[in-house]
Amino acid sequence: AVSVDCSEYPKPACTMEYRPLCGSDNKTYGNKCNFCNAVVESNGTLTLSRFGKC
């Protein structure tokens, strides 16, 4: 399984860097920061499906 380390999140602001990640909610997140913030908000229910766009 693919995974990312979200231990240093949430962060108050994310950069505009575009390195897309596909979440288990079938939504494409622009970068790791955006994805990890969403993971924290979901209380860990959101996981990474794959790197790249959904």
UniProtKB/Swiss-Prot annotation:
What phylogenetic lineage does the species belong to? Eukaryota, Metazoa, Chordata, Craniata, Vertebrata
Which organism does this sequence originate in? Syrmaticus mikado (Mikado pheasant)
Tell me what this protein is called: Ovomucoid
Q: Which domain of life is it from?
A: Eukaryota
| S-S bonds | 6-36, 14-33, 22-54
**Major subcellular site:** secreted
- Which keywords annotate this record? Disulfide bond, Glycoprotein, Protease inhibitor, Repeat, Secreted, Serine protease inhibitor
Where would I find the Kazal-like domain in this sequence?
4-54
Cite the domain annotation text: Avian ovomucoid consists of three homologous, tandem Kazal family inhibitory domains.
Localization terms from the record: Secreted
Matching InterPro entries: Bifunctional_prot_inhibitor, Kazal_dom, Kazal_dom_sf, Prot_inh_Kazal-m
- Cellular component, GO annotation: extracellular space
Query: What positions belong to coiled-coil segments?
Result: none
**Record site feature (Reactive bond 3), residues:** 16-17
Task: Spell out where the chain is glycosylated.
Answer: 43
> Is Iron-sulfur there in the keyword field?
no
A Gene Ontology molecular function term of the record: serine-type endopeptidase inhibitor activity
Q: Could you tell me which Gene3D superfamilies the record lists for this protein? A: 3.30.60.30
